[in-house]
């Protein structure tokens, strides 16, 4: 819980870390590890209270440690009051807060779920069925009867609410945000121009009001993310094979099973550095002196970096991560070689990811 983190701040400080990214701690239905939020303005009871968060920030700042909040910008829980009101047949302020088609049978290429509410429409999901997509608009409209442009007043209101959430946690002491699925908010945005404009506008606001606030993206395309105003982007598995080619290309290590091959940091010597360099060097040159690329040890979605590795391999991997240009992120427990536990029963939507989400070993 939050008070437990506060108690361990000296441990984090003694290792030399200067910031903490917290996974979602909001009130949630916990069908996807807290990434299905029911109340963006309230700490979940299992983690403490808003006052506990404020205390954590205060004490962390005294120790020279910044606190970054996980901003789940693209969706909520089905149990969120916003979504419950959006399900109503009567028009209200939340009618267009989420993406709905114009007919319960129109599931839009399988991206939407019909038959859930009395409302005659199908809601768009972002990942699991329990994560209805907030409506930030469509950059390219192919069904004008229900798709709205990003400039529509209702879309601007959704964006205004997102900014309100960010400002609320800043007032309690937050120093920045890691934005979940940052590139996916505006739909049918094939070249990324609309979402870049969206985040650039937010960055402009925050530069004026909160110039020390850091914005970190789960975009996986640093040149686009930094052009959008983010300070840091993770070069991970979502767009390029570069990250996976370093550590997790083998079938048994790549738990999401997106890319296949051989890792460079594998003592069997079957991998190569070219796959990584082809992507990394291009992104590095495009972002140099404008923002930072992060090569993390892992996160809540990946098998732990220690999985199937020797301590010698891990020492070399950490030396690489800690000396590369950019901002290193260390997933909790990786600093002690914490192990991934395969075939664990799924917990709160973790599935194969559950083995990376265990308590400190």
Language-model segments: which ranges?
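Acidic/aromatic-lined carbohydrate-recognition and catalytic surfaces
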Residues: 1-160, 171, 182-229, 238, ...
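Short hydrophobic/charged patches on amphipathic alpha-helices used for structural packing
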Residues: 6-9, 166, 318
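Alpha-helix termination/capping residues and helix-transition junctions
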Residues: 14, 171-173, 287, 323-324
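Residue-level detector of family-conserved "landmark" positions at structurally sensitive sites
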Residues: 22, 70-71, 179, 331-332, ...
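Residue-level marker of motif borders
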Residues: 65, 121-123, 175, 294-296, ...
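Conserved alpha/beta catalytic core and glycan-binding cleft of carbohydrate-active enzymes
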Residues: 78-110, 199, 203-359
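A Trp-anchored, charged/polar loop motif used as the substrate-binding/catalytic surface
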Residues: 154-165, 169, 270-281
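Active-site groove signature of glycoside hydrolases
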Residues: 163-188, 290, 294-302
């Amino acid at each position: 819980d939050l008070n437990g983190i506060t108690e361990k701040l000296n441990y984090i400080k003694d290792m030399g870390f200067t910031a903490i990214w917290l996974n979602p701690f909001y009130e949630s239905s916990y069908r996807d590890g807290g990434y299905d939020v029911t109340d963006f303005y309230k700490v979940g009871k299992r983690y403490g209270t808003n006052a506990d968060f404020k205390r954590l920030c205060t004490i962390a700042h005294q120790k020279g440690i910044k606190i970054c909040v996980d901003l789940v910008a693209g969706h909520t829980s089905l149990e969120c009051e916003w979504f419950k009101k959006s399900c109503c047949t009567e028009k209200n302020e939340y009618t267009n807060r989420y993406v709905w088609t114009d007919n319960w049978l129109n599931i839009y290429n399988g991206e939407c779920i019909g038959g859930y509410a009395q409302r005659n429409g199908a809601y768009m999901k972002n990942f699991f069925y329990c994560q209805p997509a907030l409506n930030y608009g469509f950059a390219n409209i192919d069904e004008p009867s229900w798709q709205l442009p990003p400039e529509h007043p209702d879309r601007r209101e959704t964006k205004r609410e997102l900014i309100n959430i960010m400002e609320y946690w800043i007032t309690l002491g937050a120093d920045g945000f890691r934005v979940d699925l940052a590139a996916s908010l505006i739909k049918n945005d094939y070249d990324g121009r609309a979402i870049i404009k969206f985040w650039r506008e937010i960055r402009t606001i925050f530069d004026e009001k909160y110039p020390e606030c850091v914005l970190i993206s789960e975009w996986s395309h640093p040149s686009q993310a930094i052009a959008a105003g983010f300070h840091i982007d993770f070069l991970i598995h979502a767009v390029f094979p570069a990250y996976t080619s370093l550590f997790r290309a083998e079938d048994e290590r790549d738990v999401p099973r997106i890319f296949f091959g051989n890792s460079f940091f594998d003592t069997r010597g079957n991998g190569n550095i070219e796959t990584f360099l082809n992507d990394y060097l291009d992104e590095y040159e495009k972002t140099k002196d404008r923002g930072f690329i992060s090569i993390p040890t892992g996160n809540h979605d990946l098998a732990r970096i220690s999985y199937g590795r020797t301590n010698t391999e891990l020492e070399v991997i950490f030396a690489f991560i800690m000396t590369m240009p950019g901002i290193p992120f260390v997933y909790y427990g990786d600093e002690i070689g914490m192990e991934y536990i395969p075939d664990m029963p799924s917990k709160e939507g973790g599935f194969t990811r559950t083995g990376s989400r265990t308590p400190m070993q």
